[in-house]
Amino acid sequence: MVLLRDNIEVQPLSNNRRIRKNFGHINLVADIPNLIEIQKNSYEKNFLQLNIKDSERKNKGLQSILNSIFPISDSSNIANLEFVKYEFDTPKYDVEECSQRSLSYAAPLKVTLRLSIWDIDEDTGTREIKGIKEQEVYMGDIPLMTKNGTFIINGTERVVVSQMHRSPGVFFYHDEGKIHSSGKLLYSARVIPYRGSWLDLEFDAKDIIYFRIDRKRKLYATTLLRAIGMSTEEIIKFYYNSVTYKLVQNKGWAVKFMPGHITAHRLTSDLVDADTGNVLLKAGQKITPRLAQKYFREGLNNVLVARETLIGKYLSEDLRDPVSDEILAKIGEMITADMLNVINDLKIKNVNVLVVNPQSGPYIRNTLFADKNQDRETALCDIFRVLRPGEPANIEAAEGLFYNLFFDAERYDLSEVGRIKMNSRLELNISEEVTVLTIDDIKNIVRVLVELKDGKGIIDDIDHLGNRRVRSVGELIENQFRIGLVRMEKSVIERMSAGDVDTLMPHDLVNSKILVSVVKEFFSTSQLSQFMDQTNPLSEITHKRRLSALGPGGLSRDRAGFEVRDVHPTHYGRICPIETPEGQNIGLINSMATYARINKHGFIESPYRRVKDGRVTDEVVYLSAIEEGKYKIGQANSKVDKDGVLQGEFINCRVEGGNFVMVEPHEVDFIDVTPMQVVSVAASLIPFLENDDANRALMGSNMQRQAVPLIKTDAPFVGTGVEGVVAKDSGASVLALHDGIVEQVDSNRIVIRTLAQKADGSPSVDIYNLLKFQKSNHNTCINQKPLVKVGHYVKKNDIIADGPSTDNGEIALGRNVLVAFLPWNGYNFEDSILISERIVKEDIFTSIHIEEFEVIARDTRLGPEEITRDIPNVSEEALSHLDEVGIIYVGAEVKAGDILVGKVTPKSESPITPEEKLLRAIFGEKAFDVKDSSLHVPSGVSGTVVEVRIFSRRGVEKDQRAIAIEKQQIEKLAKDRDDELEIVEHFVFSWLEKLLVGQVIINGPKQVKAGQTITTEVLKGLSKGQFWQLTVEDANIMNEIEQIKTHYDEKKEALNKRFATKVEKLQSGDDLPQGALKVVKVFIATKHKLQPGDKMAGRHGNKGVISRIVPEEDMPFLEDGTVVDIVLNPLGLPSRMNIGQILETHLGWASINLAKKISTLVQEYQNKKIAIEQIKKFLIKLYGENINSVLERSEEEIISFCKKVSKGVHFATPVFDGAKVQDVKDMLKLADQDPSGQVKLIDGRTGEYFDRLVTVGQKYLLKLHHLVDNKIHSRSIGPYSLVTQQPLGGKSHFGGQRFGEMECWALQAYGAAYTLQEMLTVKSDDVNGRIKTYDSIVRGENNFESGIPESFNVMIKEFRSLCLNVKLEVTSS
């Protein structure tokens, strides 16, 4: 047993962990990877390479960009600016300070640059170094990521969402027969680089191949082939095989027999063996590929064909006169009847022709002959004219342009991924470092395109996850950085060329503003940098794991079709098929699956267990969609014996293309890790997900993200076992940084003495300051509560404090309530919800919302604005909540219209006489006219002031309130310092005591004598400071004491220095925006109780609005008198098909009844009626092996565990591997309940039983962020639109109700002419009529007159703008 100071016993915190009865059957081999590592790895590891030494940094991220941009040289090569290394300074403010001061959390980037200046000898041209200057240059502040994977930009927390985009590489498609009326498939290829010009190749309806660059005008593909330097002969030789026709005297031509090119058909002429002259098949007989192969095997090498057969074939080389060697026909020309006669006349023996047949079409040859360009120069000029129309084309410019397009690494980058994809698709073996196009690439793209047209190979599936990759934060910011540095490079070159380089230093050349503005713009305005969804911890995690197909370089909503949005077989285990928004973004915004991760190339990987010879091993392998296609993968629930050997004759496996096959166990390569790897985090929190309809599951996972954190949190009785992981990874709860023992705890902070000692042997101290009532991005309340007590022993990563929506380290988005499914007087019509008054009374669904209000005192033209209590024309009563400075007290209750901060603004006044001016100058009197510009509580807001923050500009004197707040903060910092010092001192002096006791004194303070032996009593008589004055005989001990003293002094100094720095920061004043003298922020917390109109939901997509709050005595109740909390409509189930909620209700019913049973057992044990063994037996029956760790503890601890589950037993039913119907029935039986889960219910109003049994049970319900208080509003007096003079609309404008077109029709249908008239005139935009009506109401009359509505005048004006003059003319009758 370990004892703390003051003899408090140390207890392990793990004893407090919640134990759930788990229904899962599959043992988890792999842990869920950290849920936010996708963000952190991408930015900190891959982009910034933060805590890595300069020499060990890899060439990626920031390092690779700086390497690629530098060195920068001027045009004459006299000056050269090189990059040496970069590093980050510590940020000026920490995360919390940035949030409070509306600043960005960023660190200064310092880059070391070397400027070399050369001397060039004008005569010889030789270069000599003239001078080298190296300097560290500040390149702006780069935003840092917080520990939770977010960024603080201008004080708000933002998330950069990962983007799914098409992977770089080459892709082959066809148009699905949509372009041409005949439905013919037109094939095309597209080369997509990471950056640079796109290259498209396509067939047209006439089977000619064209290419386009960047979707400009199309040109013949052979122009491109000629531009890369291929001649006609090379083109034909590369794409076609050649065959020789040999003349056989008087018989025809002998040609090689090629059985591979034969398709089944009837012969038009005899099949004759050229060598023997035998006729093998007669004309009219059928030949098949199999028969052709048979003849070939039997020795048929050459066949005889008629002379005319050559007509229509294409020459595979120039046809020359055998005598004069004159060219008769060019390569590729078609043999005509005339040409055949010439061949006969000249007795040419051998003719070489191209092999063109249905398996190898004449497309390239036809394109060659359609193309007018015959050489490289004309081809290049042609391309130049298309890309630069209007510019004169010369060969140098054309060559330069073409090279820059695809072959210049500065302008074209396929990226490593693109090169890998290109190599695998074109079957090439080019080094991965070559990230530009090569001549081989272009030749082979055309080859594969032609092969596709010939029916070989298949087109690419664009939605396959092997063809889509993820760009995470690091990569997105890397691209912005590159843009910024390229712009900066231009300005560096300009500055080098402009001035005298000899006198310049590196910092004179670099303008960091260009870079900073690009990065700033990305974080503040990019579509992918989003305001973090901070409603609850789950919504934060989901936001960080989101994958968006939208954004720059991605798709747009309007153009995205069904295919892109649809679920694809490769999504399995990578992207969740359930969680996606409803509406126009459906399928374009997805969520990563629970176990998925992103590899270095940006492809999503999913984990699998390796299977060797039919035995499942514990080796976990991550596979991307491309790799997965090569294997046979079994499902996680395949039957396995205790040794891991797959059972059964055949196993159902997934193979490429999303197909399923049955294979023998030894053929299986991998099996899924767990069935849960298919879905996302939010979906994995839904118990019985497998029993819900997919549409409802989608709503369920989306609505969990809208659940508001409640005052009292309560983890679900029926969970899935993932709750703890979500709470831990979300960053909402506080994790212990090291192993240690809790020294102090209160509601604001936890102090832990760590057990991991430092190098000097002294303990370090961890102080955790908890967040209290902070406002989240969505105005919900962030509040942390400690879970530990003094003396608890905590391990690293234990949860020591709960955050919002967490309960004992598990995520708790709602509450467990007793639900009955029955109709109740029509109050639960159309998904309405009926709730008991108890829920409101006991604050079961009460939440706290915090709003922030800000007022700025500025320096105006007429003088400074002032924050003051002295406000003109305001009663003392209205100022009762304000302090002497004019700022509201913390704790004040406020309602709409109350003053929060008093402020006056000078207003211009009448000119003053010189005498008055003189008096004012003498007496310094400020008799300025001022107007009230105070901050009031807006309409619809009421609550308690929980915090006030005051920021004053540097140099502006602070007011009393600001000084008081500052003092409070300094006291808090001093307490942290003193506590840490106290723990260190306690350790140091107890160590000294151990060393000194038993030693002989040589010298020391007055109280001790030389030669005396030190005892504990002697030391007690000395003060702590006097310990250091003692000198003892043992020299070794003296050395050790000296070392301890040095360490102690260093530690003390470090703590004081840190304290002083923080205090200085507090006292120094703030950086405020231009013109602002002082900023005051007031935070108001409002308690929202549940009320009619609030939206609630379960986890299965079952949502509804509260219709009525019923007194407890009128609600239905159970036979034991328990009143039902909520009544739901049973008709909301059958059509919605989310049966999971019924199973959850049944299991919840078992949960509370089992808890009652355990409580009864405990009571009997305490009354000495039963032994502890009976309780143990029951717990084993209920929990199985999970409970062993509890049963090993003492009897008191077992009883304390039983008391913890007295409200309800917690279950875990993992997704797709959870409780079956039989398990639920077994639990109900164990709880001594009817296995149907239904009970007799009594009507609270009549006291009679309902006719039928009713399903009753505990269900987990959430209160959603759609609160009626934020939506309902009414208008009495308010603003009008300037043009139409009609009241504005909407709550934010304090607007009225729109009486629209259809509402007018309704009144017309009733014939309510007068009602209609007043609606369209005095109640809307008849200005004079409005005033007259008001007058008549004031006078007590009830008549009014309608005039012409303003909108009629607007219409007349619009007519006039069309030059139509409309006048109202009254003619006499």
Curated annotation (Swiss-Prot):
It catalyses: RNA(n) + a ribonucleoside 5'-triphosphate = RNA(n+1) + diphosphate. One of its GO terms (cellular component) is DNA-directed RNA polymerase complex. Its EC number is 2.7.7.6. The RNAP catalytic core consists of 2 alpha, 1 beta, 1 beta' and 1 omega subunit. When a sigma factor is associated with the core the holoenzyme is formed, which can initiate transcription. The gene is rpoB. This is DNA-directed RNA polymerase subunit beta. InterPro entries: DNA-dir_RNA_pol_bsu_ext_1_sf (IPR042107), DNA-dir_RNA_pol_bsu_external_1 (IPR019462), DNA-dir_RNA_pol_su2 (IPR015712), DNA-dir_RNAP_su2_dom (IPR007120), DNA-dir_RNAP_su2_hyb_sf (IPR037033), RNA_pol_bsu_bac (IPR010243), RNA_pol_bsu_CS (IPR007121), RNA_pol_bsu_protrusion (IPR007644). One of its GO terms (molecular function) is ribonucleoside binding. GO terms for biological process: DNA-templated transcription. It holds the Pfam family RNA_pol_Rpb2_45. HAMAP family: RNApol_bact_RpoB. Keywords: DNA-directed RNA polymerase, Nucleotidyltransferase, Transcription, Transferase. Belongs to the RNA polymerase beta chain family. It comes from Rickettsia canadensis (strain McKiel). DNA-dependent RNA polymerase catalyzes the transcription of DNA into RNA using the four ribonucleoside triphosphates as substrates. Gene3D superfamilies: 2.40.50.100, 2.40.50.150, 3.90.1100.10, DNA-directed RNA polymerase, beta subunit, external 1 domain (2.30.150.10), DNA-directed RNA polymerase, subunit 2, domain 6 (2.40.270.10), RNA polymerase alpha subunit dimerisation domain (3.90.1800.10).
